[in-house]
Amino acid sequence: MSKLYYSFTVFFLLIVSCSTSDDKDILIAKGGRIYGGKASYYASEKSDHIFPMSVISMYDQRATAPIFETLLSYDEEAQKLVSNLIEAYSFSNDNAYLNLKIRQGVYFHADSCFTGQSRKLLASDVKFTLDFACSRHALNEQAQLLTPKIIGAQDFLNDTSVDFSEGVRGIEVLSDSSLRLRLIDSSQTILKILTHQSLAVISKKAFETYGNTIANHPVGTGPFTFNQKSAEGIIFERNPNYWRSDNYGNKLPFLDTLMIRFQKEGEDIFDSFTSQKTDLLSAIPINEINSLFGTLSDAKEGKNILHKVQHKKGVKVNFLEFDCNTAPFNDSNLRKAIYHAVDRQEICRDFLFGEGSPAEQGLLPSVPFFKYTRSIKNPYNLRLAKSYLRKSSYKEGDTIIFHVSTKEGSPEDKWCLNLVEKLRRTLRLNLRLERKSFNEKMNLIQSGLASMWMSGFISDYPDAESFLMPYYSKNKGGSSLKNSHFVSLEFDTIMDKARAVMEPIERNEYFNLCVDILNQKVPVVPLYFEDLVVVFNLRLRGARVNSFGVLDLSEAYLKPIK
């Protein structure tokens, strides 16, 4: 009898063992959510950077967001900061320093660099991240963010040795779970800056292992882990040890796989979406949605795909930008001539079909964190434009190349062509348009081979300072945002005052003065503010996009439409 019982017990345990091994990854979600599946979408531009401090565009940010997480995030609906990788923070009474408490139970992705060592997120990782963002390292494009804020950051940036053994003296590790930032100014805007996707936390151990090849080995704490990057795109896989859960208690994320696809020549992104090979469209003019998708009743009858549109009053500003350091645009009169020759209302009315808002007051949109305090007349004035042109040193016949990264035939491309024709006709500028990919255009700009180009900017954190810092000449480092080489001591002085003020109304007024100076000196010609439109296949639930253009798929799941 005992032998029979023993044999049965062993047999039962073997069955349970095999069953457990086969079913261990099967997860059942509450609240109608579903685990598993693969979601994908096409990127509007190919991303070359999967490292937070190297990103130079919204497309790069979207590629890093699944892997890397920020210390804080911004809740747009509540208009407040939300703890992320830190669970608490506090300022000293005099705002001289900021203490951060690291969230417990957060681990970096499994990677060979941690062999035999803990993957737990520590304060030393956060210090290393912030030190890196203040360094001269070739991978760092973000020195402008923290060097004006933290004591010792500028000195560290000036150190050509790029030695991380000590780092920034104003960033102090107090324990494994806490650190202190000693601050230059008292405005508390550093909290908003810490929501910046380019300050997402990286692993100190990963950098010690991979060094300058760290961008090929992205290791973060986010909902997805890096699988591979190829000519096809970037593949991410579910992080089984992710720390967050949703409101139902479901362990996130739901998706097994996420893919950001790179478009090949001849591929139709819209066809891929309508055939459900991809799950969202990240760039589509809102005026074309009805013509492309038809009506809701059509979709229910199977004539087209059921979809959901997220339309955000975006904070993206589109503008013309000049290299103010070299001819011909080191001549402010030529810049002013173009500033007054552009009809912003025409662009929005005739080419953007009423979508977007003319940027007639300046570079900043009117948003919760910035309000214009004065009215400005429509800057379009051909008589004034011609007056400035006569004062300029421009010689008729001199060729000016206008670099754009537009898709031929798109509304944006059409207004760019119209602008070239109009400036030729009204100001007799010998202007020529050249189309380049985004990365090609950026390479030309950063190498000094472009003098005028079409550009766009999305605020990376919810503060007016974000829009204005690229024109602050004390803003040190190799940031790609400083393309115009604009220098104004008057602008810098007012920015210094704005950065030191706590009172919101006074601070807002200083920022208005900064906008006035930009309108007068014209390093850029603000054109229009663009709304962000993302179209989701209705089977993809829980996906979100914010006004800063970052896609959040941490709570996204696939659910068949019945």
Predicted regions span which residues?
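Structural transition elements
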Residues: 224, 329-330, 357-392, 406-414
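Extracellular/periplasmic solute-recognition and catalytic clefts
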Residues: 227-237, 259-325
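Detector for C-terminal structural segments
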Residues: 188, 337-371, 411-421, 443-562
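Aromatic- and charge-enriched surface segment that lines or borders ligand/interaction sites
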Residues: 87-142, 180, 269-272, 328
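A structural "hinge/loop" feature
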Residues: 45-62, 85, 112-115, 188-199, ...
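Gly/Pro-rich hinge or "lid" segments in bacterial periplasmic/extracellular proteins
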Residues: 76, 157, 162-178, 182-252, ...
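Ligand/substrate-recognition segments at binding pockets and active sites
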Residues: 231, 390-459, 532
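N-terminal lobe/hinge region of extracytoplasmic solute-binding protein
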Residues: 42-93, 219
